[in-house]
Amino acid sequence: MKKTTISYSILTHNETDSLLKLIEFLVKHKDEEDEIVILDDYSDNPKTKEILDVMCSMHNITFDQRHLLKDYAGQKNTLTRMCKNDYIVNIDADEIPHKSLMKNLKPILESNPTIDLYWVPRVNTVDGITQEHINKWGWNVN
């Protein structure tokens, strides 16, 4: 039986520390047959460029650049076409999947082969958040 494979897809633009943490996490927790795919909106932050150059070459990450030009759907569609595996997990550059998700994702996918789409709830954790931030960004805390 063929192994289930996953493409972890990430859109980026000038992310730095969070992107590095995400890549390091995925490299550590993904299976060997899985891939990391990054589409960058021509980041102009030198630190972001360095992270992408180093991490993509060190870890055989599929990487390309495309101008967003207010076309988020086109950006996501381009990223999707870059992915080669059975399933795609879209991750924001400032998110880290839970370790239990990484461990249990393939068994869940393999035991439900007729399901094409999964919704994964997430918990946002923001260091140093204040009520002012919550009000400014229109977040709900519940």
Per-region residue spans from a language model:
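Short, acidic/glycine-rich phosphate-metal binding loop used to engage nucleotide
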Residues: Q65-Y72
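Catalytic-site signature of metal-activated, phosphate-bearing donor transferases
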Residues: A73-T80, H98-N142
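A generic secondary-structure signal
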Residues: F25-H29, V54, T78, M82, ...
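Acidic donor-binding segment of Leloir-type glycosyltransferases
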Residues: I23-Q65
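Short aromatic/hydrophobic "clamp" motif used to bind/position activated sugar donors
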Residues: I88
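N-proximal low-complexity "stem/linker" segments adjacent to membrane-targeting elements
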Residues: M1-K28
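The conserved acidic donor/metal-binding loop of glycosyltransferases
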Residues: D92-I96
